[in-house]
């Protein structure tokens, strides 16, 4: 039996709202100041790590209490993750840092089935969470001897300039090799559930970005780790594991000519990846982060359908914002092109316009960080038609299976249900198993430990989409197009 120790670290919420503030992530209008209260669940006599495997935080948003459940993102790094920089004479200096006890988490809000969270706990809480359909960001205020944090909505980040931020290259790439085409255009419910896929990602940082952060390798590393943690969370609904395989920082000079012509830079970077980077370390996709201002208000470019190709499985992303979440959304978008996704636009008879979705051609003030149904269909079609082989196999990870920890609010190996604090009457807190006679413990289609009847509305209609309804066989509330 696993016993749980509750540790209360800090108490209270400071009920203060401000109109404007300058944060590490940029200028923000309309924010809340909170003091999160931390409650940690640990097995008795557990070996203490610097960063726990699972944590809970309580604070208020808009006057309402929320409970944020976090679990360490153990798939963030590959087991052989490496970092490379360069000596003044051009020699590669590669290290293999220990990253198992890292400080990057994913999670959700208690009692909000559609919530998500991606948080760095390295120095306070920094990241984002989705609550009741709204995306909020949180970060420490960096006040002396204070645990104060700012919470604010995505749309309240002040623009650093007024020019629209756009994706540049979305050119189709067709292989010269024979490609097996799908015999059916209709995607079956089984296809819609998305098979598990794995992308080993390489991030390259150019010299301009390195100097932008005062040649501080630690600052660059933290920024990239935060970015990839966000990206991995955004790809979870598609059943894609993004694992950071390597970080290559051009610390002495650029190893290619990085210019504002994004098409040219992307092509040259693809050549360098094929001839140099792939020979050094195996990976599936490489993206170059640059401080160079790209032409035509472009902030990112990538080859569509290029995933797994030695030259074309690449992208180029401008580090255009102090806010790492905004740059992470852009890289998520460009990886989407590598995976066959088109822009969310109305064209060729397809009604796909979605200004707030990840694959919108122009970044929105109200970014939702969701993939549209059109993007999901594009991705599934890419898998069916192109059958990319490199993303089939799971990479070695720093920690693939954790010891079950009761009370961490995320389902782990051997558990049937989430062990709540306080306990859920449908779930045995000692074993994380359903109590006798219970079919479920929670979920939009669970009521008093039993599945709701087939046809019960579990999510009301939004826009052009109809109501989502329970199946009577599960506690999940399936999207209408998964039925």
From Swiss-Prot:
Q: Name the needed cofactors.
A: Zn(2+)
SMART domains for this protein: DISIN
Which residues catalyse the reaction? 334
Q: Which PROSITE patterns match?
A: ADAM_MEPRO, DISINTEGRIN_1, DISINTEGRIN_2, ZINC_PROTEASE
EC number of this enzyme: 3.4.24.-
Q: Which InterPro entries match?
A: Disintegrin_CS, Disintegrin_dom, Disintegrin_dom_sf, MetalloPept_cat_dom_sf, Peptidase_M12B, Peptidase_M12B_N, Reprolysin_adamalysin
Which segments constitute the Disintegrin domain? Answer: 403-483
Q: List, for all copies, the residue spans of the domain called Peptidase M12B.
A: 197-395
Other known facts: The disintegrin belongs to the medium disintegrin subfamily.
Q: What is this protein called?
A: Zinc metalloproteinase/disintegrin
Q: Which organism is it from?
A: Protobothrops jerdonii
């Amino acid at each position: 039996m696993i016993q749980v120790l509750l540790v209360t670290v800090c108490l209270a919420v400071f009920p203060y709202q401000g109109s404007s503030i300058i944060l590490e992530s940029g200028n923000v209008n309309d924010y809340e100041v909170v003091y999160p209260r931390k409650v940690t669940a640990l097995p008795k006599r557990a070996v203490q790590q610097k960063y726990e495997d699972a944590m809970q935080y309580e604070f208020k948003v808009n006057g309402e209490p929320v409970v944020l459940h976090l679990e360490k993102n153990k798939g963030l790094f590959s087991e052989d993750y490496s970092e490379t920089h360069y000596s003044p004479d051009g020699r590669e200096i590669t290290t293999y840092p220990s990253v198992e006890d890292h400080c990057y988490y994913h999670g959700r809000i208690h009692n909000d089935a559609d919530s998500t969270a991606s948080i760095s706990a390295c120095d306070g809480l920094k990241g984002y969470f989705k609550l009741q359909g709204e995306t909020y960001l949180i970060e420490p205020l960096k006040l002396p001897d204070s645990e104060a944090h700012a919470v604010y909505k995505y749309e309240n980040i002040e623009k650093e300039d007024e020019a629209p931020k756009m994706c540049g290259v979305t050119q189709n790439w067709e292989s010269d090799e024979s490609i097996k085409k799908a015999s059916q255009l209709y995607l079956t419910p089984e296809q819609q559930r998305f098979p598990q896929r794995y992308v080993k990602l390489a991030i390259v940082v150019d010299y301009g970005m390195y100097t932008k952060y005062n040649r501080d390798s630690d600052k660059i590393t933290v920024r990239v780790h935060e970015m990839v943690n966000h990206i991995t969370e955004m790809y979870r609904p598609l059943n894609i594991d993004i694992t950071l395989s390597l970080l290559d920082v051009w610390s002495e000079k650029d190893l290619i000519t990085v210019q504002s012509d994004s098409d040219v830079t992307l092509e040259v970077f693809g050549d360098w990846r094929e001839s140099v980077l792939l020979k050094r370390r195996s990976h599936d996709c490489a993206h170059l982060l640059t401080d160079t201002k790209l032409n035509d208000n472009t902030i990112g470019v990538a080859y569509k359908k290029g995933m797994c190709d030695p030259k074309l499985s690449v992208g180029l992303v401008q580090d255009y914002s102090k806010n790492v979440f905004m740059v992470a959304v852009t890289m998520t978008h460009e990886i989407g092109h590598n995976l066959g996704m088109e822009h969310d636009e109305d064209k060729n008879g397809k009604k796909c316009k979605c200004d707030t979705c990840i694959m919108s051609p122009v970044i929105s003030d109200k970014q939702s960080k969701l993939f549209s149904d059109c993007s999901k269909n594009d991705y599934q079609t890419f898998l069916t038609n192109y059958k990319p082989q490199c993303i089939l196999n799971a990479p070695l990870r720093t920690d693939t299976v954790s010891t079950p920890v009761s009370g961490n609010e995320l389902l782990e190996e051997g558990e049937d249900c989430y062990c709540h604090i306080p306990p859920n009457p449908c779930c045995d807190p000692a074993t994380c198993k359903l109590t006798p006679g219970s079919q479920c413990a929670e979920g939009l289609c669970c009521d008093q430990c039993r599945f709701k009847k087939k046809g019960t509305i579990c999510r009301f209609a939004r826009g052009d989409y109809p109501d989502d309804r329970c199946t009577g066989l599960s506690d999940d509330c399936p999207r209408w197009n998964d039925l």
